[in-house]
């Protein structure tokens, strides 16, 4: 993976439609044309908008993976001198959760996503969430361009 300059949360917000607290990823640490590596501590934030009754279910790990894919699409478009078309999450496949709750994890989440195929907003990504050496979640998302 190529080492690009780290991208902070303020810049991430310019790449995806998520705003405020729904922008779940804190930093892009590396990316290249095929993949991205991000870090997040928002799973520990009591104000995380995905929490219910103070708990953050592991099912929301899939949103973290999808946001990494969206950020990657935005970075690829920007590198090509364009703006990424709006897309939506059309499918989740092979989703596996290896924990029950994200708020129990006291370490930063590491989110990696790899573009398997597709261009623009019509892409398939594989993602992995981990905390240090512990696998948290994994799956495959399909992003489709809005009509």
PLM features: residue spans?
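Single-stranded RNA-binding regions, centering on S1/OB-family and related RNA-binding modules
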Residues: 1-11
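HotDog/MaoC-like acyl-thioester-processing domains
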Residues: 2-4, 71, 104-107, 112-147
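Short aromatic-glycine motifs in intrinsically disordered, low-complexity regions
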Residues: 9-19
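Catalytic strand-loop segment that frames the active site of acyl-thioester-processing enzymes
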Residues: 20-57
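Small-residue-enriched segments and motifs
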Residues: 23-26, 90, 111-113, 139
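Conserved positions in beta-strands of structured domains
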Residues: 26-29, 98, 114-116, 130
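Compact, glycine-rich, soluble single-domain proteins
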Residues: 53-72
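Hydrophobic beta-strand-centered segment that forms part of the acyl-chain substrate-binding groove
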Residues: 71-112
């Amino acid at each position: 993976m190529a080492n690009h300059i780290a991208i902070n949360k303020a810049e991430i917000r310019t790449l995806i439609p998520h705003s405020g607290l729904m922008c779940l990823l804190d930093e892009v640490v590396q990316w290249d044309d095929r993949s991205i590596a991000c870090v997040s501590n928002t799973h520990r934030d009591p104000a995380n908008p995905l929490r219910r009754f103070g708990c953050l279910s592991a099912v929301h790990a899939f949103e973290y993976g999808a946001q990494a894919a969206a950020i990657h699409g935005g970075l690829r478009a920007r590198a090509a001198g364009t703006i990424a078309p709006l897309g939506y999450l059309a499918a989740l496949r092979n989703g596996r959760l290896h924990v029950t709750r994200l708020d129990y994890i006291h370490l930063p989440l590491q989110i990696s996503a790899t573009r398997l195929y597709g261009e623009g907003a019509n892409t398939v990504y594989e993602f992995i969430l981990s905390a240090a050496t512990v696998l948290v979640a994994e799956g495959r998302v399909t992003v489709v361009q809005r009509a």
